[in-house]
Amino acid sequence: MNPQELKSILSSGLLSFPVTDFDAAGDFHQAGYVRRLEWLAPYGASALFAAGGTGEFFSLAPDEYSAVIKTAVDTCEKSVPILAGVGGPTRVAIQMAQEAERLGAKGLLLLPHYLTEASQEGVAAHVEQVCKAVKIGVVIYNRNVCRLNANLLEQLAERCPNLIGYKDGLGDIELMVSIRRRLGERLTYLGGLPTAEVYAAAYKALGVPVYSSAVFNFIPKTAMAFYKAIAADDQATVGKLIDDFFLPYLDIRNRRAGYAVSIVKAGAKIVGYDAGPVRAPLTDLLPEEYEALAKLIEAQGAQ
């Protein structure tokens, strides 16, 4: 799949990023991950991101990373395109990018470089080096220490033909508008704020109709119904789901840092697809939070 073909796929439909399965000892549980992917793939997501933020990319050892990407690619080969999360220091990100390409990933989601603060020019150099190390398509994730502006993104797009997408995890509307207007159809644009459904209508109005859904991990039918309601401007359905599910869900998610991942793993366990515990430094939901989430999920009905 060439970068432009991937760009076309990412320009419509719902995206998601499966949680990564760990066993009771905290090790990668391949069989559980295969079962999860086989369950989620038929629900109609346009693409899945393996080892993304919700997939606890930041906690995977190099050999585990390879195992996760290979498992996802092999399992979903005939059903849905797999993009691989890559990130961290430039040379580490390049190694991961080349490994993901070797294993058959259709594209990459370039997560932020690690801890170091850097100038716009430095971040742009980092992105360019990763893009030029592979032939597959790259989506850049503006989040945390990665905050590229429209000018530098435009320059990167000129120098890197395989830079095909921009995912926004900042929520800076002025920046999002400037990027969308400046780069036009050169990139595809993805909403990437945690629990993106809450922002989906606003982002669609900005020209960003596609987003990645975390709750697809445990209520895929509801997640697809919400996306279709957004696409159809069905404000009644959107409003009801936000009131009945997403706002109470956010109340649980916002209680502790890191719960954006923990709550998704809890949801997967509730619906019978236990992915095991989160890895430190994340912490799992407390029992009362788990029970509150279970009630919300039950109210959404069979998936």
UniProtKB/Swiss-Prot annotation:
A Pfam short name: DHDPS
Molecular function GO terms recorded: 4-hydroxy-tetrahydrodipicolinate synthase activity; 5-dehydro-4-deoxyglucarate dehydratase activity
Record-annotated membrane-spanning stretches: none
CDD domains: KDGDH
Class in the EC hierarchy, top level: lyase
UniProt pathway annotation: Carbohydrate acid metabolism; D-glucarate degradation; 2,5-dioxopentanoate from D-glucarate: step 2/2
Protein name: Probable 5-dehydro-4-deoxyglucarate dehydratase
Organism: Ectopseudomonas mendocina (strain ymp)
